[in-house]
Each structure stands twice: as structure tokens, then as C-alpha cells.
Amino acid sequence: MDLLKKLEEKKDDNNFLQKFEETKLNGKRKLSSFIHSKTGILVDPSSLFDVQVKRIHQYKRQHLNALQIIAQYLRLKNGTNKYEVPRTIIFGGKAAPGYFMAKLMIRFINGIADVVNSDPDMDGLLRVVFLPDYNVKLGEIVYPATDLSEQISTAGKEASGTGDMKFAMNGALTIGTLDGANVELRDLVKKENFFLFGKTESEIMDLKNNNYSPKTFIDPVSYTHLTLPTK
């Protein structure tokens, strides 16, 4: 990170910035080609690549990201929301052999992808991809191609991994909770370059101690009432 700070000297260098954008786009083209070869899904390299790749687990909250996709899909179908740029949402990760809920989450994400990607109304707006057999080698293709890194694990649950740092060092912005290495990353890149998400560990404990009802967070405006059962 100390070495990368030297790049701040180039922030007004248009020639450098153009080369940086070209390098990012080439990385996205490489990942787009890989996605098509492995899944048959065509994605636009110029779309925003919104990525969550990590072990599938409830506290890592891939299912929360998936529910957000449903809400965005419904907004787009109803014409109440338009992305400024097309968006490709990419998942990757493996589930432990005996972890039924994690395997169900993978099935859920693939089901959403089937619906979204087969809907002609979503052409040029939204694509959803689950990368099969995600591993370190595949990460070498994913990290350089990512625009937005999803680091939304439940605060207080995540060990201090390095995935968020790898994304950041390859030019991705981060949306994340104050958990694990996100805390250090936010200090390094500064608050204005980190999209803070969710509650802190102490706020979560307060909710649990006060026997909160999840129904109080279901908001008709955000379409969560259509993505979650209320009865």
C-alpha cells in the first residue's frame, strides 16, 4: 500500500489515467471471455463489474446480495430504477461439503441468474453470474477486472483476510462493513473512497439484546417487501 501511494502523484496525469482505464478494460474483457466459455453467459465488458467472491457462508451474506438483485430486478421491470451504467453482478465461491444452507444459497443465486439473464428486458441493464469452481487461479482473472468489491460480512464475524486488499490494489472500490481487514482498508483509502455498509458489531449486539423484529426493516420503498415473506 505504501508503494501504491506514489500513484497519487499521477492523479492529474491524463495519459496515465487513460492507460489505467485501458488496463482495467482489458482485464474485464479477459474475464468476460472466461465467463462466456464457462457459463455461456454474454456480459458487456464496459458494464460495471460488481463482485462478491469468497467462501459461501451465511455470515458472509451472499444471500443478502442476492435479495438485493431481486429488488433491483423488480425496480427495473417496473421502470422505477435505471442504473447509470449496465451492471454485471458476479459471485464465486465454494460451500463446505456438509453445509446445506450454503449449497442452497448457491442454488438460489443460480436461480436468480436464470431469470434475469433470460429476460430480454434486462438486456443492456443487468446480468448475474455464478462462477463455478472458484479458486486462487481464477482469482487472478477476477481481481483485475473488478469495479466494485462486495465485502458485506456481518460485523464481528470475519477474520482478517486479504481478499478486500487484493481487490483494492487492483483498482476496485469497496462496499463493506466495519469487519475484518475492511477496518484497516478504510483507514488506508480514506472514508470518502469506501462505501460503508450495514451496522457495526456493537449495533448488531444491541439489536440482538433488544429482541428486534426483522419485519421492522422491511421497507416498501426499497422493494424488500417483495423479496421477503412478511407472514
Regions found by a protein language model. Give the residues of each.
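Acidic/histidine-rich catalytic neighborhood
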Residues: 183-211
